[in-house]
Regions:
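Class I (Rossmann-like) S-adenosyl-L-methionine-dependent methyltransferase catalytic domain
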Residues: 1-65, 75-125, 145-149, 168-229
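A short glycine-rich, Lys/Arg-flanked "PGG" loop and its adjoining helix->strand segment in the class I
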Residues: 151-163
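A short beta-strand submotif of the Rossmann-like class I SAM-dependent methyltransferase core
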Residues: 138-141
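A short acidic, Gly/Pro-enriched loop at the edge of an enzyme's catalytic core
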Residues: 124-136
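Conserved beta-strand/loop positions that form the S-adenosyl-L-methionine
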Residues: 72
């Protein structure tokens, strides 16, 4: 992707980076009283919210031993999820240098065979070669960008996947009971949330040559399993 194209999204990407850098470093957020009075805020502070809304990507991924998997926007995924039990080779890309450094310092210690490192960069500009992954995953962050940005992410995921590879991602369900309040909470934390209708994601997937193999609805997000023609 061109440098100019990256610059079009620089403000939102930087805001998202700062929001998660602070969370990973356990730095306090200076929030107004009305934000701290929200029930979702209390769940967020107790870390119960992330567990409740996280998408179970592995249930749709269909991992097989020695699959090569790229986790886009991986955070500290390799430290949280049982990648070793899945016996797949883990590659990552992340905008947060805090998360990237944490994984690269500990990932190889956990499993030097399966952990292949995390690169720093945004989702629309993957730092990997064409056609090398069996699975690509991007959960928890499509909601921070407009649909035209996600088009670029889909095209990049398609580029790095093998012909028979699949892409697993999620999008926020605007009809979820907690969607609007969650978007408000994230606004207080420094980032904008786009409540894009799910049908628009369905249409976009088709426009870029994708086929929806299956979906799964969660507390806040809908999970997609997509192949490309």
């Amino acid at each position: 992707m061109s440098e100019l194209l990256s610059d079009n999204w620089a403000t939102q990407i930087e805001a998202l980076k700062e929001r998660f850098d602070r969370e990973y470093k356990h730095e306090p957020f200076d929030l107004p009283e009305e934000a701290e009075s929200m029930p979702l805020f209390r769940e967020w502070v107790s870390h119960s919210l992330s567990a409740k809304i996280a998408s179970p990507f592995w249930e749709l991924a269909g991992f097989r031993k020695d699959h090569r998997c790229l986790d886009i926007g991986c955070g500290v995924s390799f430290l949280i999820y049982p990648w070793r039990d899945w016996s797949v080779f883990f590659y990552g890309q992340e905008i947060s240098s805090v998360a990237r450094d944490a994984l690269n310092s500990r990932g190889s210690q956990l499993n030097s065979k399966l952990y292949k490192g995390v690169k720093l960069g945004a989702a629309h500009d993957l730092k990997y070669d064409d056609g090398i992954f069996d699975r690509s995953i991007a959960t928890g962050f499509s909601c921070y960008f407009p649909l035209d940005y996600w088009r670029l992410v889909l095209l990049e995921a398609k580029r790095v996947l093998k012909p028979d590879g699949v892409f697993i991602f999620d999008s926020i369900d605007p009809a979820s009971e907690i969607a609007e309040n969650w978007a408000i909470l994230e606004m207080y934390l420094g980032v904008e949330v786009f409540l894009t209708p799910l049908q628009e994601f369905n249409n976009l997937i088709e426009e870029v040559g994708g086929k929806i193999l299956s979906t799964r609805s969660g507390e806040l997000f809908q999970l997609y399993k997509v192949s490309f023609t």
